[in-house]
């Protein structure tokens, strides 16, 4: 699963996920992409599950790019622990997603195969997504 190799600080504040994606909003590497139209978080497990779904469907064909990286630690306190006594330990990592962000890209497969692979991947993700293709001549 994806997670940072090293971090300067183990824990991070919650923050707010606002605005729309300006970087990473166009298909840059492949021919087809899976674009999120919702705002939210993708965990490393969700990204990996979607990647496996795409890989299994396209079999040996095509090249896949993961355009997001889960670099934000989410901390939780253990069950039945009283409030206070500091912040909990980091449990997992998430990628903050703004509307318009491309999550996956693929090249080397027909459009119908890419659509079906991304449909299977979208079922693993908690956000609404749409299929996009590269603009010809751009």
UniProtKB/Swiss-Prot annotation:
| Superkingdom per UniProt | Bacteria
Q: What is one Pfam family matched by this protein?
A: Ribosomal_L16
Query: Where is the stretch described as Disordered?
Result: 1-20
CDD domains named among the record's database cross-references: Ribosomal_L16_L10e
What is one cellular component GO term in this UniProt entry? cytosolic large ribosomal subunit
Q: Which family does it belong to?
A: Belongs to the universal ribosomal protein uL16 family.
How the protein assembles, per its UniProt entry? Part of the 50S ribosomal subunit.
Write out the function statement from the record: Binds 23S rRNA and is also seen to make contacts with the A and possibly P site tRNAs.
The molecule here is called Large ribosomal subunit protein uL16
Annotated source species:
Verminephrobacter eiseniae (strain EF01-2)
Q: What is the lineage of its organism?
A: Bacteria, Pseudomonadati, Pseudomonadota, Betaproteobacteria, Burkholderiales
Gene name for this UniProt entry: rplP
């Amino acid at each position: 699963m994806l997670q940072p190799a090293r971090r300067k600080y183990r824990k991070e504040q919650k923050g707010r996920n606002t605005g729309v994606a300006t970087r990473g909003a166009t298909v840059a590497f492949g021919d087809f992409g899976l674009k999120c139209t919702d705002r939210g978080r993708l965990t490393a497990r969700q990204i990996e599950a979607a990647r496996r779904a795409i890989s299994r469907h396209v079999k040996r064909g095509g090249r896949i790019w993961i355009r997001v990286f889960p670099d934000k630690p989410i901390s939780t306190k253990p069950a039945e622990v009283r409030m206070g006594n500091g912040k909990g330990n980091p449990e997992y990592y998430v990628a903050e997603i703004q509307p318009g962000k491309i999550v996956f890209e693929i090249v080397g497969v027909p459009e119908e195969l890419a659509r079906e692979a991304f449909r299977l991947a979208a079922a693993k993700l908690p956000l609404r997504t749409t299929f996009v293709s590269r603009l010809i001549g751009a």
